[in-house]
């Protein structure tokens, strides 16, 4: 698949998920109450990514991976890799979080 097409498709999916998710404050409250709430973490990352807030989105996904990397067939890891394409205009940020992800998985 063409890289630009993939980037646009990922952005649309993030926006759709963000539109169907509770607000960020409610998601953060849910995560604070239950740190293992991976579903809320995934939704929060989508909300943040849809707003081009990639660093907090990546951090949210890394935290989910730290808690349980296998959850939902590694959904957080897969989502993080997808969001790297959205943040391609911030190569240093992507490099840091790719490295952090690699370190966490190895």
Each language-model region and where it sits:
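Alpha-helical adaptor scaffolds
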Residues: 1-34
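Structural register within alpha-helical repeat arrays
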Residues: 9-11, 44, 80, 101
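Structural motif corresponding to the intra-repeat A-B loop/turn of tetratricopeptide repeats
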Residues: 16-18, 51, 87
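Short coil turns that delineate tetratricopeptide repeat
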Residues: 35-36, 52, 69-71
């Amino acid at each position: 698949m063409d890289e630009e097409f993939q980037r646009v498709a990922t952005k649309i999916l993030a926006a759709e998920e963000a539109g169907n998710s509770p607000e960020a404050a409610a998601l953060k409250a849910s995560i604070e109450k239950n740190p293992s709430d991976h579903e809320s973490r995934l939704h929060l990352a989508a909300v943040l990514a849809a707003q081009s807030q990639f660093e907090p989105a990546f951090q949210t996904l890394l935290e989910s991976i730290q808690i349980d990397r296998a959850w939902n067939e590694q959904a957080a890891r897969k989502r993080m890799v997808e969001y790297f394409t959205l943040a391609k205009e911030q190569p240093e940020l992507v490099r840091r979080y790719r490295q952090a992800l690699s370190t966490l998985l190895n």
